[in-house]
Amino acid sequence: YAVIPKNFDAEKPSALVTGGVHGYETSGVQGALQFIETKLAQYAEQVNIVVVPCVSPWGYESINRWNPMALDPNRSFYSDSPAPESAQLMQLVSDLALSLTLHIDLHETTDTDNSEFRPALAARDGVTHDNWNIPDGFYTVANTPSPQIEFQKAVIEAVKKVTHIAPADENGKIIGADVVSEGVICYDKKSLYLCGGM
């Protein structure tokens, strides 16, 4: 389901908040729900905000990264996507004719990435899995073509007030990507078909 404004105002910017694209990343779902309960009304005067708190409800209920067809919804944001979760979210954004100024896609990295989900993916795809350091702390993933580093830094500074920021590993990386600013890495979200690249 989605929480959408009663009346879209074309004069205001539009933002999308998503959680639970990977269902087992439960803090994204809980964070989106908490945002709805505690902050949405505060920002609704300035911004058209759409919140989809749980993109992959089956994954959330079954504590799973993938959907029942063993597809990763967060690698499936492309035309004619076989992942219904991804296709439905893209259709919602299209139906609402959202021109997004901001998209916050809430994720977390858990120990089960190394112990369960990444090894299963490697086995399915017939490739080798190397463990990567699971970061301890908050970090952001900027979009490589337009990283908006000053915005990322502002997010990091705000988050520092409530929790610690993930340090780089011994190779200067977080989840295998170069750290471009404290707690900030970049992915080309569109080419990876990520939710944040819509």
Task: Identify the meaning behind each predicted range.
Residues 1, 79-83, 192-198:
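Metal-centered catalytic cores of metalloenzymes
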Residues 1-11:
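Short beta-strand-to-loop junctions in surface cap/lid or active-site-entrance loops
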Residues 3-5, 18, 54:
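Acidic/polar N-terminal loop/beta-strand segments that form early-domain functional surfaces
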Residues 11-13, 26-153, 173, 177:
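Active-site/substrate-binding loop(s) of hydrolase catalytic cores
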